[in-house]
Amino acid sequence: MRVTAKADYAVRAAVELAAAGEGPVKGESIADAQEISLRFLESILGELRHAGLVRSQRGADGGYWLARPAAEISVADVIRAVEGPLASVRSEPPEELAYTGSAVPLREVWLALRVNIRAVLESVTLADVVAGRLPAEVTGLLAP
C-alpha cells in the first residue's frame, strides 16, 4: 500500500483537530502546525466535511472541528474519505479480479493484504494517536 501525501495530510489534519478538542480550529493553525499548504489542506478538509468526519463554520470565530468524538473515528475512516477504498489492485477491488493459470492464487494474496491493512487502520482511532497509545494489535506487529 502506498500512502499518498493527501492521505497523510488528511490523517495529520484530523489528528490536529482531535488534539484541539472541542471548538473550531482555524485552517491556518492546522496548516502551520503540520507544515501543509493551506490551499491543499482546505481541499482535504472539504472532503472530510463531505464525508461527515469534520464540521466547519465560516467567519471570524469559525474553523474546523471533528463531527464525532476522536475515539469514534479511525485512521481508516479518514483515508477512505479522501482516497476511497483502502486496498485495490489496478483500481479494482481484489474480489473482482480474475486471474488464470499459475497466477490464480494472487487473488487470495491481495484479499489477505486488504484484510490486514483494514485490521491495522480500522483499529487505530484519532484518540489513540493523540494519546500516543496504539492498540496492542498494532504495536505487536512492530516487535522483533
Where are these regions (language model features)?
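C-terminal regulatory/oligomerization modules of transcriptional regulators
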Residues: 95-144
